[in-house]
């Protein structure tokens, strides 16, 4: 199935001291007549492969396909956009109207909002706390003003642990957010780092939903000449952080088994590297996982944005059952209709598509039912 590949996350031409814009150093957003919210991909990179055609509309959507829940939908509160500009970055083009239009085009009834990278951390504790609060309140207001159209994954000011614990309480108890949105790494620290244990212990106590989104890792930039880091490293950073939870010294995956993780992009490279995870346990012989790492990753959830090609689905479904898959778009960086087309092209049954499109999301977050 041919798709038009939009560009990747725009950012600075060089990394900041605090890695605030660790998502792409290769390009700036441009306006395309068909959809000004899409980003320009590296020029000519995929044209030679015959993958340059525009995404076609989903034809003859069924009733179930008109009630999708999108769990990977970014928004940009004005205060976040201002902070990005202040620190030398550029926010993606976003508006409430453009979000709703993209949702309607692809039959998305409800989108769960999460901040566009890099979130709220720019190196200053007080700024991070203030931004997290302001962005979360903005998202909660969008949800209130548009009944049934939005959910919310609240932002935290990590790596500020104390501020994050306060924001968890406010976001979940006061704002009634549907879950928490985190990034795969913060500077040199991945989610399994010991520094983040207090945050995950609190999330575990609450049996919280935790949606994760990759960033461009501090360790790996410009490894392939002319290829933006997010083309490769986003998927790999997801796998790194899952490994940190399972194999890290803190043992977060074992200490906090009730955190309900959603991993972006069909798990990144995890489905293709699971054999290496298995081998790691053969060597380690960790008594906490006598059956290896597979039971751990099988209980996690995976959304399908930029992870809906046939080969990606096939690999992911060798690892987890359909009950662990969720619909996601990665808007505004990609259109929801792209994921919808990918889902329809794969030989899922109607019941399986209904599970991915809506039912699993409602099972995990019943508040999205309205």
Where are these predicted regions, by residue range?
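Mid-to-C-terminal alpha-helical segments outside catalytic/metal-binding sites
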Residues: 2-36, 40-54, 62-67, 71, ...
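Histidine-centered divalent metal-coordination motifs
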Residues: 72-74, 213, 265
């Amino acid at each position: 199935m041919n798709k038009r590949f939009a560009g990747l996350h725009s950012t600075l031409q060089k990394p900041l001291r605090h890695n605030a814009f660790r998502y792409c150093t290769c390009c700036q957003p441009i306006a395309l007549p068909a959809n000004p919210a899409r980003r320009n991909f590296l020029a000519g990179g995929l044209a030679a492969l015959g993958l340059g055609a525009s995404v076609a509309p989903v034809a003859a959507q069924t009733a179930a396909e008109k009630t999708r829940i999108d769990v990977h939908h970014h928004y940009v509160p004005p205060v976040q956009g201002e902070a990005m500009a202040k620190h030398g970055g550029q926010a993606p083009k976003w508006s409430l109207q453009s979000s709703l239009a993209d949702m309607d085009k692809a039959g998305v009834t409800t989108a769960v909002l999460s901040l566009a990278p890099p979130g709220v951390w720019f190196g200053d504790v007080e700024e991070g706390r203030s931004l997290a609060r302001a962005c979360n309140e903005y998202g909660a207001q969008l949800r209130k003003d548009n009944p049934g159209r939005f959910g919310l994954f609240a932002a935290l000011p990590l790596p500020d642990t104390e501020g994050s614990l306060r924001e968890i309480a406010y976001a979940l108890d006061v704002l009634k957010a549907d879950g928490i949105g985190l990034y795969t790494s913060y500077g040199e620290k991945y989610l399994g780092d010991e520094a983040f244990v207090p945050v995950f212990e609190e999330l575990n106590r609450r049996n919280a939903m935790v949606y994760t989104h990759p960033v461009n890792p501090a360790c790996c930039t410009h490894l392939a000449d002319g290829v933006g880091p997010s083309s490769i490293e986003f998927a790999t950073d997801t796998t790194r952080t899952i490994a940190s939870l399972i194999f890290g010294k803190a043992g977060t995956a074992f200490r906090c088994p009730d955190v309900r993780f959603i991993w972006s992009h069909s798990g990144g490279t995890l489905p293709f590297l699971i054999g290496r995870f298995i081998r790691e346990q053969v060597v380690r012989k960790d008594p906490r996982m006598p059956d290896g790492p597979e039971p751990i990753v099988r209980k996690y959830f995976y959304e399908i944005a930029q992870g809906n090609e046939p080969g990606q689905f096939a690999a992911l479904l060798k690892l987890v059952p359909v009950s662990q898959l969720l619909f996601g778009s990665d808007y505004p960086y990609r259109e929801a209709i792209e994921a919808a087309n990918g889902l329809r092209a794969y030989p899922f049954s109607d019941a399986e598509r209904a599970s991915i499109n809506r039912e699993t999301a409602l099972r995990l977050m019943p508040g999205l039912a309205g």
